[in-house]
Structures are given as C-alpha cells and as structure tokens.
Amino acid sequence: MRCFRQLLFILAVMVCGHLMAQNSQRDLERLMQNHGEYFFTLTVDQPSEIQTISDLCSVASTDGKTMVCFANPNQYRILVDFGYRPQLQMPPSMLEEPVMWDGSHRETYDWDAYPTYNAYENMMQSFAAEHPERCTYFELGTLDSGRKLMFCRINNGHPEGKPRFLYTSTMHGNETTGYMLMLRLIDELCTSNDPRIVNLVNNLDIFICPNTNPDGTYYTSNQSVYGARRENANEIDLNRHYPDFDKGPHPDNNWCYQDETQWLMNLAQDYKFTMAANFHTGSEVLNYPWDTHPSLHADDEWWKLVCHEYADQCHEWDTNYMNMPHQCADHGIINGYQWYTISGSRQDYMNYYAQCREVTIECSNTYIPNATTMPMYWNYNHNSMLSYMEQCLNGIHGTITDAETGGPIVATVSIERHDHHGSEVSSHLPAGDYHRPIKEGTYEVTYSAYGYESQTFTISVNDNEAVKQDVQLTPIPNTPPLADFDAEKELVTVGSTVRFNDLSQGLRLVSWAWQFEGGTPATSTEHNPVVVYETPGTFDVALTVTDASGQTHTLTKSNYIDVYHSISIHNGEVTLADCRGLFLPSGGDCGHYGNNENYKMTIRPENTNRRIIVNFLNFKTQPNADVLSVYDGTSTNAPLIGSFSGMELPDSITATNTEGALTFTFISSEYINFFGWVATLTCTGGESVDENGMEVAIVYPNPCKSSLNIETKGLVNYGLYNSLGQCVLSGVFVDETLVETTGLPAGVYILRIIGESGCKVEKLVIEK
C-alpha cells in the first residue's frame, strides 16, 4: 500500500510538472506575442536540419545539436506549421532589470552600467567636442524613431594615405557587450597617450559605430535596454539583409533595403575600408568568411592567423573564454559556413563587394550580460581589439602614381593565382594608397588601371610585418577617357532620391558633367550626385567625363531610371495617370501587408483606348492562405484571370475588356504576413509603347544557364532587371546578340527589349 501511495505521488508530481511546463510555455508565448519577437531552442537529429531551420528563422548559435533561435511572429508561425516544436525561453533582455546610466557624473562612470539612449548620444558627441585633435563625430542618418546611427572617426588629423579601419557592433539590438566595448575603446583612443594607442591614432583612420541598431536596443524605451530585441523596428534581421554573392541582391526576399543597411553600404563604398570587425553576442568565437558558401576565402590562411591571434590573447585571461564548443571550432575560431550557413550577412557583403576584410566577433555567450561584468569583458578583449587593428598596418602597402605626372591614380592590385571572390584590392584617391593584408609568402602582384601599362612585381612578405611597394604606371598615349556609372536604384516611385556612383576610368580625369532627364537637379558636376525624381516617366541619364588633355567621353543610358506613381492596394478605384504605376501591397514598397485584410481595387487607364498591363517583379505571400486575384474587368463579376499565392512570380497580365481595366482582390489570413508583391502598371495603345507589340523578338533558351540569344530586326536596346528592378545587364545590338549570364545569380528576371517596332517584356529564368 505504501509503495502504491509513493507511485501515485510520483505520478502526480510528473503530471503537475508537465502542466506547469505547458502553462509556462503559454505564458511565454503571450509575452513574446506582445514583444513581437520569439526566443527559443530547437533540438535537431540531423545536421541538414540546421540549414532548413536557418532558412525559416534567425539562428543565433548552435553546437550542432541544439539551436538557439529568434523569430518574428511570421517566422515563428511558419516554423510551427512546418511541424517543429520550439521550446520557448525567456527573452534574454527580460531576465533582469539592467543597471542604466543617465550620463550624469561621467567623471566617476566606470563602464559598469548601460547608457540610456540620450546618454549614448551625448557621449558620442562629447568625444569629438572634448578631443577635436583626434576625434570627429558624424551621423549616417536619423531613423523614423528619431534615433541615429552615430560614428566617431579617430586619427591624428591627417588621415590621407592611411589604411581605414572600421569597428561596429550591435546590429542585433539585444547583443550589447560589443556596444559597451566600442564606447570604452573610443574613450581610450581619444584620451590615452600609451605608445600603442598613439601608434594606432597616428597611422590609421579609425571609424567606430557602437550601435548599428539602436531601435532594437532601445525597443521599449530610450531609458533602458530592458526588452531589447534582435531585429530592427521593422522586424528585419539586419544580418540577413545584405546583398549576397551566392543568393542574390536580397536573399531575405525583402524588396527594399532598410536604412540601417543602405547607410552602411554607402559608407563602405565611400571610404573603402581595409579591415573591419562586427561584434555580436550569443557565442564566444571568431566567425570568419564565408557565411554563405562552402568555398574558402582566398586569404583563408591569413584569416586563421589573425583570428587565432585575437582568441589566443583572450585565452591569456581565461582559457574558458572565446572557446565555443563545436566540432568544427578551432580554439576560438570557426569558418562561418562550417558553423551554420546564412545568407545576406554583413561580413560576406564587406568581403565580397567592398574589398574589406571583415570578421564577426561573437564576444559573449550572454546576450545582455549584467552591466557590472562589462569591465571583465573589456579585460578579455582589450589587447585583442588593439592587435586586430594593428594587423591593418601589416601586409603589402604603397602608393600608385602616374609615371609622367606623379599624380595618384586608382588601380587594381591583384595577386596572380590567388585572388578570387572579390579579394583583390584597389588604390584610393586622393593619395593613391593601397593596403593588402595577406599571409606570409612570395606573390606575383599585378598593378593595372585603364589607360596604363600594367606592371607585375614579385613581392615577399612575412607575418606581422609590412612591405612597402610604391608603383608608377606608364600611361598609354592618347587613351580616351571612358565614362561609366551606376545608380543605387533604377526603379523608383515619385518623390524618391537616387544616388549615382561614378565608375569612369581614364588618364587624369578632371571634370564630370551629368545630365538627368526628369530629375532635380537636371545637371550636376559632382562626382557622385544625388537626384530627386518628382514626375513619372522613363528617363535618360548621361555623364560626360573630361581628362587633363581635353579628351571627353559621354555615356548615355537610355530609359535608365523608371519612375512610377506608387499605388498600394485598398478598397476603391484608381485611374492610372500617365500609364505608369508601381502596384504594391498595403504596406507600401518597404513594409508588409497586414493580417485579416480584404481589399478590392479596380485600376482603369486614363484613356479608354488603352489597356492596363501588370508585370510582377517580386511576389511573396503566405502559401494557400494569402491570395491575390486578378479579374479582367471593372468588378469581380468579370472573368477571373488568376489567383496567386506563395512565391511563384505571376506571368504578365494584360486587360482584354473594352474598358481596359483590371480588378484586384487580396485576402490575408489572421496571422503570418510577408512583403507581398511589387509590380509595374503600364498600358497598351495610344502614345505609350505596346509592351507586347514588337513585331519579331525571339528569346532562347528560357530558362537559360550561361547565355541567352536574342533575335529581332533592326537596332534594339535591351535591359535585364532583377527582382529589385535593378538593371543588371544592358546593351544595344542590331538584329541579334548573345548575352552572357554566367555571373548572375539564379532567379527570375525581367527582360525588356525596345526597338523601332515596339517593346517586348518577358520573364526570364536563370538556372545554375
């Protein structure tokens, strides 16, 4: 009997424990619903599941079996619908009330409390105000919340010709250890006269942004980091949001870049950093390239050298620190792809697109550590941070100049049989300096520039040493300048600004003359101008460059900028003015549609002899639940052309009814929403070009892999547009041409062919 009672007691305890666990999970789910972000663990049986889950949500860390993850409400619901059973955990930012500092009595502040947002802003500005001989303060921009992306730039007042170095942190708002490390590092660089610090200030041009996601860090209040979350204010994981050389310009399938992302990309292109590091938390390891691809970086051995140096110096303080347990980890360092693959990381963008050696430093297992432990993390990382910066001074350095004038030039520095995937570097104006970190060895280094004779040198370099190799390139006489440029975006809505980037080459260019049809200003002599487009249309852009001898070259990109009226779905009717519209979901071009939507909208042409055409550039809704339907007429009583859901891009649709109208309905479910769609609205008939009216235009093969044939009659312009509306290939030909597509990522593109007989728009699929 006694044994029976004991058994009943044990069973009761087990049942109660199970019920309490269920209640705890329900309580956590309610908490996270209100917070807008879910934090959980998942156990996987097969390593292949890690990639599947990584595609569905944000994996923060994994030991190969247990995954620590974050998800926005959409991602979490999809994960559950896929059959996964996440174990919710208390959000790290809500485990305790953090100690905050309001900025008062700074003379006694010991870096053991998190600053309020206002204290952070005041501190950043005061660094420059109090130490103008070393520090300048600037802002990349102000977010909709009023919070800013703030930088301190530190040097000895003479930055020309020196390597540029970048430290950033906290692109995930709830990862605050690096935030505190960066603030304290700025303070030391501004105030210390230690010879090691003075050497860095004198020989580097240092940029530091302690917090690149302030909306995430101060999500609940400017007064506290309590409730900080990983994503930004728009529920975007900023470390999945960058262009990816393997997965395309927007691997997270969001149509437009967040301000935080675009501003950092602009900064990288403007300043051409030599080295960088981006601080995260959630693990303790240095994660080096690549994140997105199994191939090794060209400088893989160099990456192991500098990462081991960082981790080894941390181990001098504590052998258990910076030593993540993982089968692929090597004493505190790990290749990103071998850990777990992600697409759209900042690290991969900087290395591939910006010629900058950037590493990801995971500097604490705890997301928001107790602020009193910050001095400990400073001790662990201090020497390592300085050593990593000092590596920017090693390798091959020099200036590249014109052999006749001695003036600095922009040239490419490439290493034979070594460089690939963007590992080559370039020299920079105004000094013509270049900086090439590299592992010890003997290399064949080639220096080349348009209009100059290339030179190749055999250069030997040792680890942790610098070799100087100045180069003079001999100009090729009478080489004409070559104008070239690109735009930050080519498909925009009325009122948008577009930044243009000069890519011209030539001997001693002295002037740039831009013409912007339909833009304000209409002309510019700036190197990289910014233009506003206030009226709809398709506009040319022309650039004329002139060299010192007076030779000129003009490049005109016809129909380069497409400007449309913005038309978001709603209940009612719209008359398509100018036959140019960008059809968007209720969230606009950068937001998501909402839950429980039920819209019906009819779009009519301005003139009755025209018909509406819709071409989808991007499409993503919740499969089988959120549905966009299109009817050939002015109501839902008209014939149904099609209903679309999921990720497959709909074909081009043209109205055939006498009024030329299309009616759209959109219904969304009670949960899970995506960005929806982006589609151009144009017209047939009248003065507008018939988008399917070209007499002869044969495009094959479709799908294609490495090349595409276009056959037509006469002189023809063509443009190939990616899912963002960016022109990735363009050209002019007569009768026929072969277009090489080898360098383009797999995906769906829009091919526009314009000739004397009309225009043809066709969906093109590129496969790999």
Can you describe what each PLM-predicted range is?
Residues 404, 474-488, 564-574, 681-700:
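Residue-level detector of functionally pivotal "anchor" positions at catalytic/ligand-binding pockets or at interdomain
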